[in-house]
């Protein structure tokens, strides 16, 4: 969710809490749709991985699905950055996007996911990350993951970035407080995401907070806690 849109929504919903209203924010270049007039950069690594799929279809004389897969190879997708070791993929992606921008003479928008919170995926453990809040994970997340991530994007001022922050994380802690691991991770999640928002403020970066969806937080028992959690998160960032 775009920060300005989220602030507008939360201001309208503010009557559910005792918090004072959010102050209006001035317009800037990041308040427009960052995708307008730009090419969605096609992740060359992902495109390369699909060559195996193309070849498999061709081996079956299935030219139709081979052609469909080639279309996907040239379609912009998000690059997931999920570990400190994976930070090097940002430079690789930036270099490839600059090459494509020079080749086409068209402005590229690079789509990234930032996903490495301490105690990640607290309700399922399916994507357990490298940081633990019990072992200074929040500080390590800030200094060894978010800081270099932000520095890399800010240095590439000639490109535009759309960054999704920590998918599923807020929805997880809002709706899974009955799970001790999630309850204990709540403060870490909120502080980590707030820090990432603050560090990724730049004219060439558009941020989207994964605030779940209506089928998840839209139920009566989830809506008010969800709005309050987002309000507190953004106030902490502001």
Where are these regions (language model features)?
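N-terminal carbohydrate-binding/catalytic regions of secreted carbohydrate-active enzymes
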Residues: 31-155
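Surface-exposed substrate-engagement region within the catalytic domains
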Residues: 55, 59-67, 199, 203, ...
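Secreted/periplasmic proteins that engage bacterial cell-wall peptidoglycan
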Residues: 211-213, 217
């Amino acid at each position: 969710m775009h920060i300005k849109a989220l602030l507008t929504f939360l201001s309208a919903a503010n009557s559910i809490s005792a918090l004072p209203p959010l102050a209006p924010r001035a317009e800037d270049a990041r308040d427009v749709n960052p995708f307008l007039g730009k090419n969605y950069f096609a992740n060359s690594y992902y495109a390369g991985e699909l060559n195996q799929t193309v070849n498999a279809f061709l081996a079956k004389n299935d030219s139709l699905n081979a052609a469909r897969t080639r279309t996907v190879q040239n379609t912009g997708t998000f690059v997931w950055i999920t570990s400190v070791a994976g930070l090097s993929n940002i430079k690789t992606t930036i270099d490839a996007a600059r090459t494509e921008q020079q080749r086409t003479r068209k402005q590229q928008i690079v789509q990234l996911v930032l996903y490495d919170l301490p105690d990640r995926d607290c309700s399922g453990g399916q994507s357990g990350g490298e940081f633990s809040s019990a072992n200074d994970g929040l500080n390590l997340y800030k200094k060894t993951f978010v800081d270099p991530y932000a520095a890399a994007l800010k240095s590439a001022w000639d490109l535009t970035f759309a960054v999704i922050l920590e998918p599923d994380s807020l929805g997880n802690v809002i709706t899974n407080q009955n799970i001790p691991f999630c309850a204990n991770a709540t403060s870490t999640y909120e502080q980590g995401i707030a820090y990432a928002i603050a560090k990724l403020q730049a004219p060439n970066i558009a941020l989207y907070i994964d605030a779940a969806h209506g089928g998840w937080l839209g139920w009566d028992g989830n809506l008010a806690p969800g709005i309050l959690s987002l309000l507190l998160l953004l106030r902490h960032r502001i």
